[in-house]
């Protein structure tokens, strides 16, 4: 059994999260900005499907990206050099979320339900949720979004409409956040896609200790002022 959350944004200790399913900690509550930010600051995130109650997770081990461990394959490096593209931040946040929510091959549905879209758009409006976007030929070709607290970034989801478009946004995000003093990016759960870019699993204790250190630091001024245009020679 897992606890059902009350009206206050208070969570049980993450040490109480289940092993099966990995990381399930609590259910219920709401998707208010206050509750979501409290959750992220404690290493917890919401993840549920349409028709389910709100479920809160803190898996162990945890998938993270340390920016200095970013891997860029030869083919991706070639794309970075030879493709005409533009990277923008926060120019189309709702569109990025809706694109991430679109059904994908082999999946019956999406966890980015309308309530989640509304909740994260509210976080974006108050400066806590951000998108990194790849634009090609004037069109949104791929990107990702996540939540930022202090010098901690929590990646949520990504999408591609063109080959490698989400990877382009990811590489620029990692390099930019590293320049801003971010030392760890939360990727939540293991995927081969993220592992190919250098993300890896770490223990819950290491994750929480690093998170605690990062969230207490104020963000640098103009942290989200980023724009890059690449034209192949």
Swiss-Prot record:
Functions in the N-end rule pathway of protein degradation where it conjugates Leu, Phe and, less efficiently, Met from aminoacyl-tRNAs to the N-termini of proteins containing an N-terminal arginine or lysine. It comes from Chromobacterium violaceum (strain ATCC 12472 / DSM 30191 / JCM 1249 / CCUG 213 / NBRC 12614 / NCIMB 9131 / NCTC 9757 / MK). GO terms for cellular component: cytoplasm. Belongs to the L/F-transferase family. This is Leucyl/phenylalanyl-tRNA--protein transferase. GO terms for biological process: protein catabolic process. It is found in: Cytoplasm. InterPro entries: Acyl_CoA_acyltransferase, Leu/Phe-tRNA_Trfase, Leu/Phe-tRNA_Trfase_C, Leu/Phe-tRNA_Trfase_N. The gene is aat. Gene3D superfamilies: Leucyl/phenylalanyl-tRNA-protein transferase, C-terminal domain (3.40.630.70), Leucyl/phenylalanyl-tRNA-protein transferase, N-terminal domain (3.30.70.3550). It is an enzyme of class 2 (transferase). SUPFAM superfamilies: Acyl-CoA N-acyltransferases (Nat) (SSF55729). Its main location: cytoplasm. GO terms for molecular function: leucyl-tRNA--protein transferase activity. Its EC number is 2.3.2.6.
